[in-house]
């Protein structure tokens, strides 16, 4: 029989005489168990409750109950693994959720709560307590992972634990998380780590009514709100960095925003409410950092770091987790921002047909989100076309109706990839210019892609075949970035991976209906290894058609993805089934084999090339007929693909774009620069726009630009731009000192 009210009523009755600590405890209890007003007939609620019960029963069934036990679960028997300690507390929390959550059959089960108490006592006695002399294995489990699980356990089992039990568990948390500002003994905590530690400290303080520690935890949140210019945190351009030099918006950044939302909502209205005025920056992060990177509910993998190697953490799972945190934030936002945020979340959820909308949403949020989806007064936002250069993390996003495109680079500022804790073991080339094309094929990167794709042939990359560089390595050049104007971009990367045997100059020009990829100056000092540039390596189903022109000028995959090769034949392709396992890329993954089919397209530059090049154009959404028509009359002109400059033009848009590769005077397509620069010129509607960026972020002076066009008057101008001449050619001095890769723009009227 399902009990739905007696225990909850008894717990909530205490609120009639509650102090602020009790209010916070009850609020957290409601966040975990769903709170009042749940519609148990809603399929999503029923599914969530069934999942809670199933999980709790599974752990309860396998729990070792013998008084002489040496472990709680057979698969968590190690006394040397900190991760197993966190996992054990996580399982006990899952069991406690089963006991504490109304609407399913374990609610209020006395035998279950007795076994939870007994197991928790064993775990405190034998693994995690205030008497442990020092942390071992992974600090994260001691200071973050376990405190978060144990803290929630104290909330869920309040009234079932004796004061002595509560004190012991709280003392264990305090032993390792007494000051959220510090981690690993004396390191200042930052980013997601700071927020996690604050939440752990808050939960402990609630349990033992420690006002001083609760105030410390609340005050410690303030440090994350200001924008940063180095290290961990959010940057003005929307980037998010964790672990010093890793792009992590969709990993640690997503955890950051979700945990922060929980924390702010929990403390709202209490004596410990977080009131720093800078907290309003979080609403800017939602639009500047997360909005560009979530496409139809999927968080782009290029900002998820080593999490891509986790079987249970797909791009859609990560996107929904971020959406849940962002929705919770919307309930704290000013009215105007709240409606905008909820419209955005609605778009992500309704456009993602690959996953149930309630996946990843807290039980207490299912009803509010259901109401949002049914509310015609808040429409789904729709697609947001645009281009974003995330200069602080060497990432680029381009979005057009029906598709989105991402570029993952690295430089002397940003690491190539992260592989710690035996995760992301094949991430060798994910930062070497890997490109991600998102279309209506929503599961392209979530259906076993990472364990089965050839890690030596990732789309967009130029690779020394067989090379396996170490993780946490910076590149040999500072050049990685680009410029953007009116939704179009030019991006560039000087590829010089660790090892020093390969070099390449790579550009992408991101247009209205195409992506132009150019490469030059490709060289290698390895005599026996071929160098390849990978155009595509796409997961396909069944016998998806791959049509190729006789002259090699164009190809089409699946009837809706075109490729144009300006130089005709000279590229290669193959279709093959590949097998892999999650264990191969993550030590904690399953060893079970997975097979997926791929269509691969690449250029083989041969062994030890010197000055090799490539050019291709991606045509998302184009059929074979449309690709053939494009090849017969290309809409984009490749003006230059040399060691000095890469340049393209599209007359129909009035767009010219040049990436300059040297600190020497150079003219390409009527645009002159004296320094390394990314430059776009857009002429339309009686105006000319010039966008300039320093992709090195190392130029402490200026870039001088000349455009073969006269201008009549200034309409808009960045303060860093000085106009030296308006006619007969437009001459500019662009001060890029401290611009940090930001695009600087000028808009003038034309004659």
Question: What are the roles of these predicted feature ranges?
Answer:
Residues 9-17:
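Hydrophobic h-region of N-terminal signal peptides that target proteins for export
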Residues 1-7:
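Sec-dependent signal peptide recognition
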Residues 18-44, 748-751:
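Intrinsically disordered, low-structural-confidence terminal and linker regions
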Residues 263-689, 693-715, 724-726:
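Extended polysaccharide-engagement surfaces of secreted carbohydrate-active enzymes
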Residues 392, 562-564, 612-615, 729-751:
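C-terminal beta-strand-rich structural cap/linker in extracellular carbohydrate-active enzymes
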Residues 42-45, 57-311, 316:
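Aromatic-lined, polymer-binding surfaces characteristic
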Residues 717-727, 731-735:
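Solvent-exposed serine/threonine-rich low-complexity stretches and specific carbohydrate-binding patches
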